[in-house]
Design a protein with these regions (language model features):
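Residue-level signal for short amphipathic helical patches enriched in basic/charged
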Residues: 31-34, 118-121, 137, 173, ...
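A hydrophobic, helix-centered structural microdomain
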Residues: 13-81, 128, 194, 199-215
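Short, hydrophobic secondary-structure boundary micro-motifs
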Residues: 40, 54-55, 83, 137-139, ...
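Juxtamembrane amphipathic/hinge helix adjacent to a transmembrane helix
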Residues: 1-12
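Short, glycine-rich, amphipathic interfacial segments at transmembrane boundaries or analogous
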Residues: 1, 54-106, 165-184
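A short, structured surface patch at a secondary-structure boundary
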Residues: 95-161, 200-208
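Compositionally biased, charge-rich terminal segments
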Residues: 9, 180-195, 215
Length: 215
């Protein structure tokens, strides 16, 4: 089954359909939510100094580096705040090193915390989708340090564009272990279809509203 579906991922017609759906939905969606984007930008500027957006390096299709766009959710001196926090709370270093996440992250602003819980901080990635660096649905974008955690699954990861949403997001998000996340990403890649994308997109909205596994 996995072999057959991997051939589908290489099928130009199927990939063209996926790309067309990405382009149409991201453009229409971006226009529809533009007023919301403006309000979020104003809230960020009013709460803390610094830019509204920030870019992060991630690994994209073919192993190439892409620069994903997000709303800024942290203070400007985030790295300094993090290192101080970990020094003062050494028991939390293991939690940080395991998944690069903290349940009570001191770097995150009040507006940023709300944006993360609702996943609204990732809306600017619609631009990455339009540009062709990401897909609406796909594996969670990873950084270089995560390659070793993916192991043999990394080869599968680089076959497709990373997504704004995916099986991980609709299956528990941060409540899942990293191993479970890799398994879900690999399952998606090996069982990809247009209908699976539609199902994940449909499930994304209630998951976001419910905020399950978000922090």
């Amino acid at each position: 089954l996995c072999f057959k579906v991997r051939q589908n991922l290489l099928d130009p017609k199927r990939l063209a359909l996926k790309r067309a759906m990405d382009l149409f939905l991201s453009v229409v969606g971006g226009i529809a939510i533009f007023p919301i984007l403006v309000l979020i930008a104003l809230a960020i500027k009013l709460e803390s100094r610094g830019p509204v957006f920030f870019r992060q390096n991630r690994i994209g299709r073919g192993g190439q580096t892409i620069h994903i766009l997000k709303f800024r959710t942290m203070v400007c001196n985030a790295e300094e705040v993090l290192q101080t926090y970990l020094r003062e709370n050494p028991d939390l270093r293991e939690e940080w090193e395991a998944d690069q996440k903290l349940r009570n992250d001191p770097r995150i602003t009040k507006v940023g915390a709300w944006l993360r819980k609702t996943s609204l901080d990732e809306l600017p990635q619609l631009w990455n989708v339009v540009w062709g660096e990401m897909s609406l649905v796909g594996p969670r974008p990873i950084v270089d340090d995560e390659i070793v955690k993916y192991g043999s699954a990394f080869a599968s990861y680089t076959r497709v564009r990373p997504g704004m949403t995916g099986l991980w997001q609709v299956s528990g998000r941060n409540d899942l272990s990293y191993k479970q996340r890799v398994h879900l990403d690999r399952f998606y890649i090996c069982n990809w279809s247009t209908w699976l994308d539609i199902l994940i997109l449909a499930k994304t909205f209630p998951v976001v509203l419910g905020r399950k596994g978000a922090y």
